[in-house]
């Protein structure tokens, strides 16, 4: 059991593709009537545990919600017949059910893409967006060959022995021993076939969402965070182009890879805290 299971309330939402598990912690209205809502969205194949350090830091002063996306973590079994827009709709239904209105979306990798899809579908509902090792959803940033390769990730993963894939993924996504151990723990919660199929499906779903997205214009402050040692695809290049094109502030997280909030939670938490002060002004 971790801090999320120990201190947050587990709730469930029955989506068309399966039951979705999520965890909620509310700050006492008497203690902080204006406490913001932080919505944590893990990346592809990751689960809620990747945000443990953020929950520990902010749950005393902020309302927090974190989920396991469909087919991830405890949100299994689930039918792999959903789009990124469907995921945004499921999240929207959850937030409505919890009576959460203005909120700050904090998405790591795939979670950042989901946040952008959410803001495109439900403009004006989000008070702030923090991208952690994610990239823009708009198709102008991507070459056709890049999206083609993304769509064929499953075959590449299946060509690698499972134990080797676990070790390579842990080393590729994290820089620290803790980050790599946490990535391994998330991966071994799946069978080999389950992981490869989920990853392949998720990347195809993402590529299709990017191809269909010509423009996203968040109606809120945006902060881009990226591990200085992120070696996942072209994430660093995408973030450089993203900040150049939009003017969104980009902060490089030291001593961190693709899972920057796990590798260097102190630096990421400091950036989140600073962002919250800016949004609350």
Regions found by a protein language model. Name each.
Residues 2-19:
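N-terminal cap/lid segment of alpha/beta-hydrolase-fold proteins
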Residues 262-274:
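Post-His helix in hydrolase/transferase enzymes
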Residues 18-74:
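Conserved HGGG/HGGXW glycine-rich cap/lid loop of the alpha/beta-hydrolase fold
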Residues 23, 56, 65-106, 270:
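Active-site loop/oxyanion-hole signature of alpha/beta-hydrolase fold enzymes
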């Amino acid at each position: 059991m971790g801090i999320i299971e120990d201190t947050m309330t587990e709730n469930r939402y029955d989506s068309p593709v399966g039951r979705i598990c999520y965890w909620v912690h509310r700050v006492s209205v008497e203690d902080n009537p204006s406490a913001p809502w932080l919505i944590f969205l893990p990346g592809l194949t990751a689960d809620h545990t990747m945000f443990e350090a953020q929950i520990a830091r902010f749950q005393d002063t902020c309302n927090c919600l974190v989920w396991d996306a469909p087919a991830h973590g405890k949100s299994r079994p689930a039918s792999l017949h959903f789009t990124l827009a469907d995921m945004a709709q499921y999240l929207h239904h959850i937030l409505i059910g919890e009576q959460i209105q203005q909120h700050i979306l904090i998405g790591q990798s795939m979670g950042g893409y989901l946040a952008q899809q959410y803001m495109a579908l439900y403009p004006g509902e989000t008070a702030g967006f923090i991208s952690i090792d994610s990239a823009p959803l708009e198709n102008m940033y991507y070459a056709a060959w890049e999206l083609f390769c993304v769509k064929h990730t499953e075959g590449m993963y299946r060509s690698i022995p499972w134990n080797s894939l676990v070790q390579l993924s842990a080393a590729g996504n994290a820089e620290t021993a803790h980050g790599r151990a946490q990535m391994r723990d998330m991966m071994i919660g799946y069978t080999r076939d389950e992981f490869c199929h989920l990853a392949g499906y998720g990347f195809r779903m993402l590529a299709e969402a990017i191809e269909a997205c010509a423009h996203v214009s968040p109606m809120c402050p945006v902060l881009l965070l990226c591990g200085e040692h992120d070696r996942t695809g072209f994430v660093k290049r995408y973030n450089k182009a993203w900040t150049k094109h939009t003017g969104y502030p980009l902060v490089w997280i030291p001593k961190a890879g693709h899972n920057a909030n796990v590798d260097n939670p102190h630096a990421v938490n400091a950036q989140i805290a600073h962002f919250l002060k800016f949004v609350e002004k």
